[in-house]
């Protein structure tokens, strides 16, 4: 069974979704993210993906208090990303109750620091965020594209023990146009040992079923749930 991970994106302390990472195209779904997290837990979900959009934009963690509220008020296993740029940021995230931290930009801009974190915290506490636009890794809240190609970028860290990769196809994110299944199949064919988490574009139960049929281990979804396009009962969440 594919692992199902709902997402909460935080902006100004609210639960929002963007379209293709565009801060000007935001939709607010709830003013109380901790209540949203509790609702996910009641539905039977065990995991939660939390993104600090303020942090991604300002290049340091911002919403650690909201993260703390979520981890205090639920028993969900929370992974947290957005604005993790320094040792202080990552410590704050873990102190606020994150079980895992998603790191993207630093793995591109400061690989030595990311390697240090792998050594310090262990590869099982870190998710490598690989946000892709036109085949290149994008950084800093998706505002900049790097020169890094996806597969070589992943290999560099897989060789260091990284097993968890959250891969977002930016052109799909928040569009409800279906996930980039061919991209994920390409990654899994190259690195079958990866615990790949697909993200972006999920629009319905059938998209999740298609990812499962393609052998993708896990999926993050947000807008499709908030817009009522996913039937949780049919997903078989217990």
Q: Language-model features: where?
A:
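Short, well-ordered coil/turn segments that N-cap beta-strands
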Residues: 1-4, 44-47, 74-78, 98-99, ...
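Active-site-adjacent beta->alpha loops and helix N-cap segments on the catalytic face
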Residues: 3-4, 55-71, 85-91, 105-127, ...
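Short secondary-structure boundary segments
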Residues: 8, 52, 105-106, 130-132, ...
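Conserved, mostly hydrophobic/aromatic
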Residues: 9, 40, 48, 93, ...
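Conserved anion-binding
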Residues: 13-15, 19-24, 98-173
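N-terminal beta-alpha supersecondary unit
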Residues: 15-61
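Short, acidic/polar
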Residues: 29-41, 86-91, 145-156
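Catalytic cores of alpha/beta
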Residues: 74, 78-101, 182-218
